[in-house]
A protein has these predicted regions:
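Helical "lid/coupling" subdomains associated with nucleotide-phosphate turnover
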Residues: 1-40, 55-177
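Active-site-adjacent helix-turn-beta-strand microarchitecture at beta-sheet edges
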Residues: 47-50
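Short glycine-aspartate micro-motif
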Residues: 41-45
Length: 177
């Protein structure tokens, strides 16, 4: 119908095409990207149904694995369990940790992940909005994210949505991410 009304041709991308374009845009960061992947780096693409982890070490792609831990899938699990937002952290932590422990044994082995590149709809928006506004740029530390998450636990979903300029209904998905 879009083509009939506007004359614009549209194609729908598959998951793999979308992820390829995401990775390509990350790689276009040039020298900064090349420097980052020299050390242990994981690109974590958080989708609705799954998370894809691509592991780089010494400038080489070591592995890519898909885990069924997407935001919508986990949110559905939380709804099934009638979990409140305050319970999300512990419940999701248990679910994610069980799958990540298998991933670590099979693929991570003795590698150390020094850099994490996140591709998603929620954490990326948080970093762009909150940290850029603070003059901190696109790169954040683990400590900064943990500090923000700790502060956000003290806020209502309405306060948090206003702070981040995001719809309040997106807050559960942000907690899951």
């Amino acid at each position: 119908q879009v083509r009939l009304r506007t004359g614009i041709e549209m194609d729908i991308l598959s998951n793999s095409e979308q992820r390829f374009l995401d990775y390509k845009s990350i790689a276009l960061q040039g020298q900064q990207f090349d420097e980052i992947i020299e050390k242990g780096t994981a690109i974590v693409d958080i989708g609705g149904g799954s998370i894809q982890i691509s592991l780089f070490d010494k400038d080489t792609l070591v592995s890519t694995q898909n885990l069924k831990l997407g935001v919508l899938r986990l949110r559905e699990s939380m709804n099934f369990l009638n979990a409140s937002l305050s319970q999300y952290q512990n419940l999701i932590g248990e679910i994610v940790e069980s799958q990540l422990s298998v991933y670590k044994k099979l693929y991570l082995k003795d590698r150390v992940i020094e850099n994490l590149i996140i591709v998603d709809d929620y954490i990326s928006r948080l970093i762009r909005h909150y940290y850029r506004k603070e003059g901190k740029g696109d790169i954040t530390t683990r400590e900064q994210i943990e500090e923000f998450m700790e502060k956000s636990r003290m806020k209502s979903t309405l306060e948090l949505s206003r702070l981040l300029d995001m719809p309040e209904e997106d807050m559960p998905a942000l907690y899951i991410s």
